[in-house]
Amino acid sequence: IGGVIIMGDRGTGKSTTIRAITDILPKIEVVKEDPFNSHPTDFDLMSEEVRKKIENGETVETIQKKVSMIDLPLGATEDRVCGTIDIEKALTEGVKAFEPGLLAKANRGILYVDEVNLLDDHLVDILLDSAASGWNTVEREGISIRHPARFVLVGSGNPEEGELRPQLLDRFGMHSEIRTVRDPELRVQIVEQRSSFDKNPQECLKEHKEEQENFKQRIVTAQKLLPDISLDYDLRVKISQVCGELDVDGLRGDIVTNRAAKAYAAYNNKNEVSVEDI
């Protein structure tokens, strides 16, 4: 779908909600001890080293692990984001000595940028390149290393603190806005839940464990259903008609709405997209 951006007031739980996502996502299969979270069978999601092993008929050991949630700090350097090549080692030992960056760790996971509207322009450009191609290329002194960087981009921020660059905003498939709760009873409920968690975190987690497991199972079922979800031609035309009337630039709006509607239908355990899903 292309990630999600959550904008809203300070102290409304944006970061807390986003960081909790990994607890409800099913585990993924990755190649053991691989810094890029390589997929064991999909060539578009594996490093060159793993691909060569598979092409040579070697077996690769795999493990199940939680989906990675990688934070991209606002002041991060280009080397920290993209990774670095040890030139001295490469020249003296003849090996590609690569120290993976945040993009490598985020492959097949979630890359989270808090206060995304304050991100430096040079980091925005790096994100745009990786988000568009799904690959990260690092070149130093004639040495080039390329690895998969297919991640879900998630951003949050307060719109009052600055505007988001249109090019980056265009990379987020979905947008959510959070406002401060005004209803006194609901505010009390939130404060009480927070107090109870602070007193006994383990007990609070245990209380919601069953509900969370059901939620996780619902996502697993939806993932299996998704490839077979059908979207009627007339509804596809309606989506494009609405996007046209809203003067949406390009075709990303059409594509995202089609994909999101299918995902929502799968989440609701349906085989066909309805108007309500759209």
Regions found by a protein language model. Name each.
Residues 160-161, 165-167, 181-189, 217, ...:
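P-loop NTPase catalytic core
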Residues 80-82, 164-222:
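Conserved AAA+ ATPase core "coupling" helix
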Residues 16, 20, 80, 126, ...:
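Alpha-helical scaffold segments in soluble metabolic enzymes
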Residues 228-229, 234, 239-278:
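C-terminal helical "lid" subdomain and adjoining coupling/linker elements of P-loop NTPases
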